[in-house]
């Protein structure tokens, strides 16, 4: 789509109103060329629990309803393929607000500096202390339970993780 940047906000408004009906929200909107056609990809997550497993029927129904709504959208005159999909179980946590929503979730976090001899930690994000502006994560290191406090500014990268 040559004009994707100019119509992305309008597509987002249309999609948001439809996705709310299915308790979904937009995680990311992408446009790329694949299989010899333009693809409009809308990655979604649950509104209340960002890392909750999504109902396949909700994704299909929202895709169909969104397809109908975009059919007469003037900015999409060229042929394209619509893909509404889950953002994924190990999706990146991109902001402080998203990290706050991840409290009580199992996450992977990479810090700018080592804490307890490690800069990469996988564990349960226990808490966000508003007064101290710090997060607390609990994890196991060599069989021992550890807790570490960190500020969002110390985070190099964070994502949801799967505990095995």
Curated annotation (Swiss-Prot):
Keyword Methyltransferase in record: no
Signal peptide per UniProt: none
Entry's Gene Ontology BP terms: ribosomal small subunit assembly; translation
Localisation: Cytoplasm
Superkingdom field: Bacteria
Cellular compartments per GO CC: cytosol
InterPro entries: Ribosome_maturation_RimP (IPR003728), RimP_C (IPR028998), RimP_C_sf (IPR036847), RimP_N (IPR028989), RimP_N_sf (IPR035956)
Keywords: Cytoplasm, Ribosome biogenesis
HAMAP family referenced in this protein's UniProt entry, alphabetically: RimP
Similarity comment text for this entry: Belongs to the RimP family.
Purpose: Required for maturation of 30S ribosomal subunits.
Annotated NCBIfam families: PRK14643.1 (NF011236)
Protein name from the UniProt record: Ribosome maturation factor RimP
Organism: Mesoplasma florum (strain ATCC 33453 / NBRC 100688 / NCTC 11704 / L1) (Acholeplasma florum)
